Structures are given as C-alpha cells and as structure tokens.
Amino acid sequence: MAAQWTLGLVAGGTSLAVFSRQLRSPLSDFSQHVAFARAFCHGGGLPPHFLFEVLVCGLAAPVNRAGALDLAAIAITTAAVVAKVVLTFRRIREAGASAGAFFAALGLLFAMPLFNWWKFPEVYLGQVSPNVWHNPTSIVVLPLAFLLFRAASSLTPTAPPRNAAGAGALTLLAVLTKPNYVLALLPCWLAQLAERLRRGLPAGAAGWRRPALVAALLIGPAAGALAWQASRLGATGSAIAVDPLAVWRLYSPHIPVSLLLSVAFPLAVLALHFRLARRQEPLALAWSVLLVAVLQMAWLAEPGPRFTHGNFFWASYTANYLLFVESAVVLIAAPRSGRSWAAWSLLGAHALAGLVYVGRLIAGIL
C-alpha cells in the first residue's frame, strides 16, 4: 500500500506541476479542450470525442467561478495519471516483488523515447512516445485503454455476457474519450478471439451462439459511436487519405531510427528473453496493437489544414505505453542476470529522457 501511495504522490505532484504550465502553453492542447468544455457549459456543441469536456464541465459547473474549468481540467488529468501509475504497479506486481514493481512503475511514469542526435534533447515530435503530457484526451484515455487491454487479454469467445458487456462498455468509453487506440486494438482483439475460437469451438451450430453474442456486445456500441463520429467529422470537411510517411517525415528525418529509439526497451526484453516472452499472450497482443497503430501512423493522413496535426499518431503512443508495461511484466518475472540488468538499464535511459522532458515542461522551455 505504501508503494502505491508513494507512486500516486509522485505522479500527482508531477502532473500538477506540468499541467498548470500546459494550460498557459501555446504548444499544448489543454486550452483548446478547455474552450470546448466552456462552450458546452454555455449550451454549445461538443467535439466528436467529448467525454473529457463533459467531465470538465460537470466538475466545474457547480463552482461557477473564474478559473473553475482550468482547475477541473487539471484535476481530471492528474487523476488519470495517478490511476495509470497505480494500475501499472499492480499489473507488474502480479509477476514480481513489490519493490521491483515500484521502480518499474516509477520508470514507466516518465519513460519517453531515447535521445536522438538530430534534435537533442527533444524526444517527443517524430517519435512514438509511451507518455504524453500535452494532450488531455490522450492522458485521460490511458487508464481506460489499460483496463480495456486487460479485458482484451483475458476475454474468451465463450465468456459470460456480463463480461463481454463490460468490455463493450469500456470500449465505448474509450471511443468517446479518444477513439484512436480502439481503432488499433479492435482488429487485433477480434483476431485473437477468432484464434481462441478456432482452438476451442464446441461442435454444432449452437457453439457459435455465445461467440456471436460476445462479438456483438463487444463491437456494437463502439461501432455505433465510431459511425456517429465519422459522420460528424465528414460534415466538417475532414477526410482520410493514404499518404505513406508524408506526415511522419515532417517531424523526423530518420523514421526507422525514431522507431527504434521509441521501442528500445521492449525490443531488448523481446530479444534478451525471447523464450519467456514468446509464451506471453498479453505481450504478443501489445506488440500486434502497436504494429497496427504504427501502420496507421505511417500510412494515413488528413488532407487540408489538419494535415500537419498528426492525428493518426495518437494510437501509437497509447499502444507503446502498454507494450512497455507488458515488457516490464516479462522482465520482472525473468531470472536475474546480466541480460536482465541490460534491459532494466534501457528502461532507466527511457526514464531519464522523460525526466529531462518533464523538467523542461515545468520550466516553461517547451
């Protein structure tokens, strides 16, 4: 319990320091989303993914004072970061001792891509960062994505309907907060369910009824929400184009290196402990989701004024964080050896890059 409280205090204190700065930064998305919440509080419309704005308005409206929306945004995003680090600690502790889980979760709280040589000490733009500090919807969706990934790892095609309905509700909440991660997870999740179904399908037509119900409960609500969001975006003139690497090249002159610097720790765990890692279904799912997310990031773009926004990057950030977590789970369960210490050292290097990044955010440099 002490470890969780300590992690929560570190995460909360860091978040308060960062987010209070982000509200005043022209490079941050906080002010835009607070403006959306303010418009909603005064009877205006909502963006297609609106859960954060609704929460901000709901928390601030009873106070009805200047600055209440800003404080609500800081409170909600801080709570999300605290939830993320506590969930991370609990997941890693399932495979190892509390002390190791504590330090791993602490490192993951700050982990960012390793330093590069072409824009030192910048580590965010152009890389696949496991942590995001400037976009409130990405911050808030992370704990939901964490729970959703856990559900995806354990759900079977013959699960009780209440379990499938719970997973479907989580999927819907994630879509309404920020849909990108769900768009990368769903193909992998459905493929995993199909493979589990192939291995254990009961004989006869009756054997298909429960899997069909599970799929409907899982996909139905999210599919409806995604269709509604697509229609809203289409009405504003937004579109999707296949334009390989066009957006990514704007932010990285060395895309393969950017990718390697972003996933150095998970790659090291996979390479150094392959025999253990290959037996872990959650790790395989995490890698597959990241692959789909990176393909979306690399191939898709929004023509027009939103072209440079990189809105197809978001799924890869969330997916990479969850890959880092599952890689830490494998590593903490592995026997202590020089290989393990080498992998932990890489996580430390990722955390150091993140600490420098967070320090620059707090100092107002970024």
Where are the model-predicted features located?
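Signature aromatic-anchored transmembrane alpha helix within multi-pass, membrane-resident enzymes
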Residues: 216-219, 332-361
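Start-transfer (signal-anchor) and selected internal transmembrane alpha helices
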Residues: 1-16, 96-105
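Membrane-interface alpha helices of multi-pass inner-membrane proteins
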Residues: 163-179, 185-186, 190
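Membrane-interface micro-motifs in multi-pass membrane enzymes
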Residues: 100-152, 255-260, 310-319
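Hydrophobic/aromatic-rich transmembrane helices and adjacent perimembrane loops
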Residues: 183, 305-333
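Transmembrane-helix motifs of polytopic, lipid-linked glycan transferases
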Residues: 71-98, 102, 147
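Short hydrophobic/aromatic helix or loop-helix immediately within or flanking a transmembrane segment
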Residues: 32-71
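Transmembrane catalytic cores of multi-pass membrane glycosyltransferases
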Residues: 20-32, 41, 49-50, 68, ...
